[in-house]
Amino acid sequence: MIRPPASRSAFFLAAAVMVSGCASYRLGPVNPAISAGQAIEVGLFQNATPQPGLTESVNASIRRELQRDATFELATGGDGDVLLTGNITAYRRSAVSFQPRDILSVRDFEVELVTRILAAEKATGKVLIDHELTGRTTVRLGGDLASAERQALPLLANDLARKTVALLAEGEW
């Protein structure tokens, strides 16, 4: 059966449109600065806020997320290819919802942890990533603010750790 030229042209046009949609898709890690499999050493994060206990929670969460993600190797003992450090610059809380019968009493609030992430090659000191990330979580205020913030800290650190490892693996968009 011989097809008319118009239907053949329409077929090729449709095929070209479908194939061009995949042209920008990339397989694997997209960050050329840090290749997969490199060993990342997590250094201490500096806490520039008055909120205590942030450094330990953030460091532990980033180490755990690096192991879970498995794109990079977690270096221990100073043998890493890349040194990851950071500076926790802000800890903010803002009201999200209030008690139904008392508009002055907060029921839920959002906590934000703003951190400047710095990844540098250990051998040369060349900065690979210098980026500000914000971890967020929402917390229901139960009895008192201090216990609610203690419960929110692991969630906040985990959100920041997920964003940090995604930045290392996928690069800046």
Labelled PLM ranges:
Residues 42, 86, 113-117, 133, ...:
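A structural signal for short, well-ordered beta-strand segments
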Residues 68-73, 78-128, 138-148:
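Surface-exposed short loop/turn segments
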Residues 87-92, 130-135, 159-167:
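A general structural signal for short secondary-structure boundary/capping elements
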Residues 2-5, 116-130, 162-170:
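Short secondary-structure transition/capping segments
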Residues 1-22:
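Sec-dependent bacterial lipoprotein signal peptides
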Residues 49-60, 106, 110, 146-159:
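Soluble non-cytosolic domains of exported or imported proteins
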Residues 12, 19, 32, 76, ...:
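Generic marker of residues within folded, mature protein domains
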Residues 21-64, 71, 76, 123, ...:
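A structural "domain/chain start" motif
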